[in-house]
């Protein structure tokens, strides 16, 4: 597959990792649609004619408007879909409640699932597509001290429908990537946190990943370089 005129949708495109993924695809001459909730300025600074921005607040999606919004905003054909949405509410297991759990799972997993459901049908018709859901190494540890809801939502996100086996016959592949501790705004604020210092000791390289490093793994999993792997969860966490 040649990258010319190929289209990718990146959910959570204004995140630190998302920005790097956007830049990597633009450098390969892909048409990039980047979804964002906040941080529009970071995306606009890229100033590229091949970059289109879509604003959507997943918190405002409900049973009445979800299908309508998805049809309006996410109805185009895409060759690749990458979900980097990552809402964190800083809730511990002890302090969580039904409302906060539902909110986090809806934003990080349920709405992205429904968007994927819409887009995968068009991928099947064109007989080519790549879907990658970006999860967290926190799933492995039952979530962090103050990120229980986030970890739970990412655990839900890793649930791949068994239809992926049929999709492979149409060259549509779907995978998850568990991302480890990365030098993003959230972890920068936690730098002095004792829990984070302990986690860095568990990583052989004794450091956080760079967003650019994570982006390279993400990009490779949705290019035609990956012509075989599907239904898998790949961990990129530096050995933690």
Give residue ranges: language-model regions.
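Short, small/polar-rich loop/turn modules that mediate ligand/substrate recognition or access, typified
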Residues: 171-173, 229-231
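Catalytic loop of short-chain dehydrogenase/reductase
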Residues: 130-156, 161-168, 181
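Conserved NAD(P)H cofactor-binding loop of Rossmann-fold oxidoreductase domains
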Residues: 84-90, 239
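N-terminal Rossmann NAD(P)H-binding glycine-rich loop of SDR-like oxidoreductase domains
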Residues: 14, 22
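Short C-terminal tail/terminal secondary-structure segment
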Residues: 230-240
């Amino acid at each position: 597959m040649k990258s010319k005129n190929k289209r990718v949708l990146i959910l959570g495109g204004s995140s630190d990792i998302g920005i790097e993924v956007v830049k990597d695809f633009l450098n390969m001459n892909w048409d990039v649609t980047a979804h964002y909730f906040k941080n529009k300025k970071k995306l606009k600074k890229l100033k590229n004619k091949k970059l289109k921005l879509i604003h959507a607040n997943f918190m405002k999606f409900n049973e009445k408007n979800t299908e309508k919004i998805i049809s309006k905003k996410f109805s185009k054909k895409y060759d690749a879909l990458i979900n980097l949405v990552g809402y964190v509410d800083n809730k511990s297991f002890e302090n969580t409640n039904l409302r906060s759990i539902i909110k986090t799972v809806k934003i990080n997993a349920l709405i992205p699932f429904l968007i994927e459901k819409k887009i995968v049908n068009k991928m099947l018709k064109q007989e080519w597509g790549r879907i990658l859901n970006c999860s967290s190494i926190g799933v492995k540890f039952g979530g962090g001290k103050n990120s229980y809801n986030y970890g739970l939502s990412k655990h839900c996100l890793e649930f791949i429908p068994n239809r992926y086996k049929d999709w492979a016959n149409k060259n549509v592949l779907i995978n998850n990537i568990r991302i480890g501790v990365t030098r993003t705004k959230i972890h920068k604020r936690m730098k002095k946190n004792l829990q984070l210092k302990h986690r860095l000791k568990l990583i052989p390289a004794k450091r956080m990943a760079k967003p650019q490093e994570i982006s390279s793994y993400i990009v490779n999993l949705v290019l035609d370089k990956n012509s075989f792997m599907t239904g898998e969860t790949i961990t990129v966490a530096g050995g933690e």
